């Protein structure tokens, strides 16, 4: 007979029975009170969940994506709520078993276990309640693909169709597009990119990367991460860490990687790109001039991009020249067909030559063009010999020698390099190419006029969303060819831009070279002492320079332009810089320079000195006597600030035309604005570490201001004084405002609740506001309406604004009451502005 008593779990029974009286948890005794608390807290949790879901729904309607953190919290709530429902179903049975005033139970084991579950569920509900307040619930979705702006194309549709069919073929994972320079490979790739936008394909992300001839792995990584991680928190990471970030991101995605302009094999594994496969469904498409590169990249399919057919070439040429010119004489169409035929179906040549012929209205001009294009060609390494002489016709069509020199100067920059327009014009002025009056406004205007002319001639390309230009690589090759006397004097122009050299190359013909460009070459040390009797231009920015030898500047008597900017590790210059007696342009911005060498005082011809963002520069005392001929002095965000002593120095610079400055004292700011000649020369102003109840900016005195920075300031109120001294007694209602102010950056400003004074800068193109905890509105409605009522020329706030960045503004709730604001916005970045999310919906062009 079975001994049933021996089979009972006496140890558990004993433990449970003791637990009725001895357990610290008091699961049984506190069961009823815990159940009451659980039901109340669960109701509160469900209300919190519903409120959160409502917020999430609003943000998702705006096109934002809920945060993974929010999703995780909601999932946990769902699990806890399910457990709670199970506990409710058993509640009546378990509470009915309680006896001895709730201190014991008829079934101690069951009640003990149930009470433990109630306690656990209650603790989880309380924990979730403590985490229910999310400042931000959703974020901007990275678009699958970003549309490229493409000019009208002819004869490309068939090629796009062929390439697209190849792309959607499961067997083809890597596609190579090859053909000569200027054939339209980039346009073809841009067209494929735009098809991903139009068709909303199943790919998670389409990434565009410009590779170029002298590519750097880290540069490619930065472009990829810039697309995947707009937060930019990866910028200071190492190459290997960036590779890891890219790999971790892309291995979870079905991606398309578009690589433009490969000149050699690129190690995608080293970059961090996982290989495309049938399993992940990803694709890689690249363009190159070389079929060999297609083989090295292991392309599953290669497509040759050919020149246009004669009919297609004529159609593109006709569209470029325009029917008005072609109809101006009955013989011109036939002559135009001959000119078009000389372009050999190359789209770049057809566009460039077509633009050069836009104003040719006589038969004689067209016949002359044919004669020029029939002239004997030359041989060019790496380029079909029939193309560059044809493109040269557009160069020959430029109005005068100065414009031609300006164009050729652009070839000194790396391939695909985006050149700042203002910086380019500054080079041109110091080189003596434009405007004998140097830095008067006319010089800058003339520079912009030349840039516009070169853009319209298709010799320069306008960059999107920036005040920059760049060169097509074939046009750049032509410019380098012309600049070296058609290849006969290649040693006179030394351009190593973009190459990895680390040390100054040994193959430079120092005694012959006229212009040298080592931009972004990773040069770390200059140890040579060359004899350079003809060198006039030396460009060394964007490098890793640490040391320049004592003898390097000893024998450069004709050097006019020296650019050492963006070499953060460069902390001193050799005293022998004093030997550069012809130097007119010296750029030391974004360097670690601590003090200027004594020898600088011998540079009597120096007219341009840039010391912006020199964060350790200690002194400028004596600059008026040292460099009396300065016309441009740039000190924006330099450690060195303007004080009373420097004010006196600056006033003694009789030729000063342009000044950018950093000011920390409100009284100094007031005094500077009171000196007309000084104030009128200010183009950039940085207010830093300034503490004052009120700061006044006079828009008349600072009429030339183009860039304003307010950094780490504690200012209760910023006020605009728009009256000049002469008009102060005749209160006119006409507001001149800051007519030239294009860019404003506000970082770490404490005090004001709004920035309504920005209405006085109606030509703003770029606004950045970050880490400013007291700002609640960009434009306050009451203040804004008051300003526009008095100054009726202020119609639409920020009517010309193209870029708006708002970051870490905890109290910001509104941008502007006028929803017509931001009509021309092209780029926006809004992050960590939790109270602004509802207002974003009022501005269709603004993306959170």
Swiss-Prot record:
LRR repeats lie at residues 534-555, 558-580, 582-604, 605-627, 629-649. GO terms for molecular function: ADP binding; ATP binding. InterPro entries: Apaf_helical, LRR_dom_sf, LRR_R13L4/SHOC2-like, NB-ARC, P-loop_NTPase, Plant_NBS-LRR, WH-like_DNA-bd_sf. This is Probable disease resistance protein At5g43730. It comes from the Eukaryota. Probable disease resistance protein. Residues 137-439 form the NB-ARC domain. GO terms for biological process: defense response. Residues 25-62 form a coiled coil. The LRR repeats probably act as specificity determinant of pathogen recognition. Gene3D superfamilies: Helical domain of apoptotic protease-activating factors, P-loop containing nucleotide triphosphate hydrolases, Ribonuclease Inhibitor, Winged helix-like DNA-binding domain superfamily/Winged helix DNA-binding domain. ATP binds at residues 179-186. Belongs to the disease resistance NB-LRR family. Keywords: ATP-binding, Coiled coil, Leucine-rich repeat, Nucleotide-binding, Plant defense, Repeat.
């Amino acid at each position: 007979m079975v001994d049933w008593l021996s089979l009972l779990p006496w140890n558990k029974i004993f433990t449970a029975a003791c637990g009725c009286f001895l357990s610290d948890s008091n699961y049984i005794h506190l069961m009823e009170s815990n159940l009451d608390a659980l039901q109340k807290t669960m109701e509160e949790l469900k209300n919190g969940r519903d409120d959160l879901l409502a917020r999430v729904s609003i943000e998702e309607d705006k096109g934002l994506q809920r945060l993974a953190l929010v999703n995780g919290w909601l999932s946990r709530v769902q699990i806890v709520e399910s457990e709670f429902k199970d506990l409710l179903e058993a509640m009546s049975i378990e509470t009915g078993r309680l006896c001895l005033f709730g201190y014991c139970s008829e079934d101690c084991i069951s009640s003990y276990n149930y009470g433990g579950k109630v306690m656990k569920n209650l603790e989880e509900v309380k924990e979730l309640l403590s985490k229910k307040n999310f400042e931000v619930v959703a974020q901007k979705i990275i678009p699958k693909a970003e549309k490229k702006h493409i000019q009208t194309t002819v004869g490309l549709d068939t090629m796009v169709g062929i390439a697209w069919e190849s792309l959607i073929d499961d067997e083809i994972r890597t596609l190579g597009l090859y053909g000569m320079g200027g054939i339209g490979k980039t346009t073809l790739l841009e067209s494929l990119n735009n098809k991903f936008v139009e068709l909303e394909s199943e790919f998670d992300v389409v990434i565009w990367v410009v590779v170029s001839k002298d590519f750097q792995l880290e540069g490619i990584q930065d472009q990829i991460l810039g697309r995947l991680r707009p937060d930019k928190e990866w910028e200071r990471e190492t190459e290997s860490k960036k590779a890891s970030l890219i790999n971790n991101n892309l291995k979870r995605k079905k991606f398309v990687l578009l690589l433009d302009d490969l000149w050699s094999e690129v190690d995608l594994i080293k970059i961090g790109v996982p290989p495309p496969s049938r399993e992940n469904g990803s694709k890689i498409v690249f363009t190159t001039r070389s079929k060999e590169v297609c083989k090295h990249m292991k392309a599953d399919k290669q497509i040759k991009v050919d020149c246009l057919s004669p009919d297609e070439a004529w159609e593109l040429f006709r569209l470029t020249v325009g029917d008005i010119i072609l109809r101006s004489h009955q013989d011109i169409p036939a002559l135009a067909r001959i000119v078009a035929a000389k372009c050999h179906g190359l789209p770049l040549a057809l566009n460039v030559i077509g633009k050069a012929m836009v104003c040719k209205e006589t038969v004689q001009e067209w016949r002359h063009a044919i004669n020029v294009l029939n002239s004997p060609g030359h041989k060019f390494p790496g380029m079909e010999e029939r193309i560059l002489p044809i493109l040269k016709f557009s160069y020959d069509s430029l109005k005068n020698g100065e414009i031609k020199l300006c164009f050729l100067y652009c070839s000194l920059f790396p391939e695909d390099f985006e050149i700042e327009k203002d910086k380019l014009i500054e080079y041109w002025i110091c080189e003596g190419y434009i405007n004998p009056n140097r830095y008067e406004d006319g010089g800058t205007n003339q520079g912009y006029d030349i840039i516009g002319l070169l853009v319209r001639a298709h010799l320069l390309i306008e960059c999107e969303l920036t005040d920059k230009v760049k060169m097509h690589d074939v046009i750049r090759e032509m410019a380098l060819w012309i600049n070296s006397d058609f290849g006969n004097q290649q040693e006179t122009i030394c351009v190593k831009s973009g190459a990895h050299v680390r040390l100054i190359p040994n193959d430079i013909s120092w005694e012959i070279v006229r212009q040298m460009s080592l931009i972004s070459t990773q040069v770390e040390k200059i140890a040579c002492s060359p004899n350079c009797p003809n060198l006039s231009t030396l460009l060394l920015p964007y490098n890793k320079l640490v040391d320049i030898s004592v003898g390097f500047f000893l024998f450069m008597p004709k050097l006019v332009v020296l650019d050492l900017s963006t070499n953060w590790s460069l902390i001193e210059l050799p005293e022998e810089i004093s030997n550069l007696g012809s130097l007119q342009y010296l750029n030391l911005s974004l360097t670690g320079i601590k003090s200027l060498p004594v020898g600088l005082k011998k540079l009597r011809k120096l007219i341009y000195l840039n010391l912006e963002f020199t964060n350790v520069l200690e002194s400028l005392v004596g600059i008026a006597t040292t460099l009396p001929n300065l016309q441009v002095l740039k000190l924006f965000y330099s450690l060195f600030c303007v004080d009373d002593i420097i004010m006196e120095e600056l006033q003694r610079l009789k030729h000063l035309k342009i000044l950018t400055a950093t000011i920390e004292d409100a009284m100094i700011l007031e005094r500077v604005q009171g000196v007309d000649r000084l104030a009128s020369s200010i183009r950039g102003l940085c207010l830093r570490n300034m503490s004052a109840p009120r700061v006044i900016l006079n828009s008349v005195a600072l009429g030339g201001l183009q860039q304003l920075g307010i950094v780490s300031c504690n200012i209760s109120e910023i006020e605009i004084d728009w009256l000049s001294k002469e008009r102060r007694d005749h209160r006119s209602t006409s507001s001149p405002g800051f007519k030239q102010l294009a860019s404003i950056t506000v970082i770490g400003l404490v005090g004001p609740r709004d920035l309504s004074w920005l209405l006085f800068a109606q030509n703003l193109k770029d606004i950045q506001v970050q880490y400013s905890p007291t700002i609640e509105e960009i434009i306050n409605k009451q203040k804004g309406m008051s300003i526009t009522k008095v100054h009726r020329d202020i119609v639409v706030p920020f009517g010309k604004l193209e870029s708006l960045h708002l970051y870490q503004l905890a109290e910001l709730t509104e941008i502007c009451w006028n929803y017509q604001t931001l009509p021309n916005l092209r780029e926006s970045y809004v992050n960590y502005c939790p109270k602004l999310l509802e207002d974003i919906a009022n501005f269709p062009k603004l993306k959170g």
